[in-house]
Amino acid sequence: MIRIVHRNPLELWGEPSYNERWISISGGIGGPLLIVNDPGLVRHVLVDNARNYKMATVRQNILRPILLDGLLTAEGDVWKRSRKAMAPVFTPRHIFGFAKAMVSATDAFIGRYENARGPVDVARDMTMLTYDILAETLFSGQVAGEPGSFGHEVDRLFETMGRVDPLDILRAPLWMPRLTRIRGRKSLAFFRQIVTDTVKMREARMTAGTDVPEDFLTLLLRAEGPDGLSRAEIEDNIITFIGAGHETTARALGWTIYLLAEASWEREKIEAEIDEVLAREADPVKWLENMPRTRAAFEEAMRLYPPAPSINREPVEDDRYHDLVIKKGTQVLVMPWTLHRHRKLWDAPEAFMPSRFLPENRDTIDRYQYLPFGAGPRVCIGASFAMQEAIIVLALLLKRYRFEKTPGLKPWPVQKLTTQPQGGLPMLVERRQ
């Protein structure tokens, strides 16, 4: 079991996980385990009784060495203060203000497909593109050091540090070295130093009264103070944005493009929608509300391949949900991977059917059976940013290009920090006529 968890935790879940409301395992290697697939119990754990559920030890052992007190890993008063301080940063006004940067970064990137010969790895390309978008919206491209090396170290860091180690499953203390993640330490140190230098560089400009761009970094520095963010917390959250903000959206975009190549009839509808909207609407802020089919395809891709395939919690005190007793210390796994493919919650759960998410059908989906961004107090603060970014990328990309599968392509999903295609997504790209 430990070997499977290290290789790919998604392989653990057998047929009962896709049919039962919950599964309780009392004799697990890492202690008692509860797998949650019931929307009512999801709401109980993540919303109604969220105060009783802390971040699970296994999850913290993986993420905390990288993110420290970023929003994904901070708890208690630190999390409350950080969330309150950052809420104004993620208002619609600021997110809408980043649309033009998203467009320019996407336009600059996708030009590389103009003379593409042979397969391109869409999974890797979407990772690079969303990093470029994040570099523009977070730093306005003003990164200390060599930007190319920064992007490379980001990829290496989350590739090596995001794996589950056997010691994590056994809940070993963090001072015990995880051999599987030693390679990532150099990348982490390099990565943190660049973030520190970039923050200092921007702060010096602000102190000198020099004009600075209205990007995420400037907004975060303005949130610094006794009641806001400390300098260390600003840096931790920048690293969190880079990890959660570009990796998760990139994976969802890659899966969307692959699924549309498999379902050419769906792709044709989306191409027609994109052509019609872009012909009459120049403002990218308006694209999301005017492209319901494109949005539905992206949301359906996140159902089949959720960016975060598991949400791990641990009760602080004994709890009860109807006749289910949840003991203190139990590893509670809210599982978007199985929840999104559950036989009793979805019609044809393995099929790619974007129509599920069209406006006229949304009311049939329980809020707590679909969790691409989580739920409750710790719902993803950047969900609106991610949705805007995804639609802009898909609109500009699919307006100009069409992607086809390479012969025999059947990607195997692997859980690391996100749901990734093992071996990438090699696809053929051609200019649309």
Question: What are the residue ranges of the model-derived segments?
Answer:
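Cytochrome P450 catalytic-core helices
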Residues: 248-267, 271-273, 384-399
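N-terminal membrane-proximal hinge/A-helix region immediately C-terminal to the signal-anchor transmembrane segment
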Residues: 1-81, 96-111, 129, 144-145, ...
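Cytochrome P450 heme-thiolate monooxygenase catalytic core
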Residues: 54-60, 78, 94-251, 269, ...
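Cytochrome P450 proximal C-terminal region
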Residues: 17, 106, 110, 126, ...
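Conserved cytochrome P450 K-helix E-x-x-R motif and the immediately C-terminal K′/meander segment
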Residues: 2-23, 193, 197, 281-322
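Cytochrome P450 I-helix active-site segment
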Residues: 99, 103, 152-156, 208-218, ...
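Conserved cytochrome P450 K-helix/beta-meander segment immediately N-terminal to the heme-binding cysteine loop
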Residues: 334-361
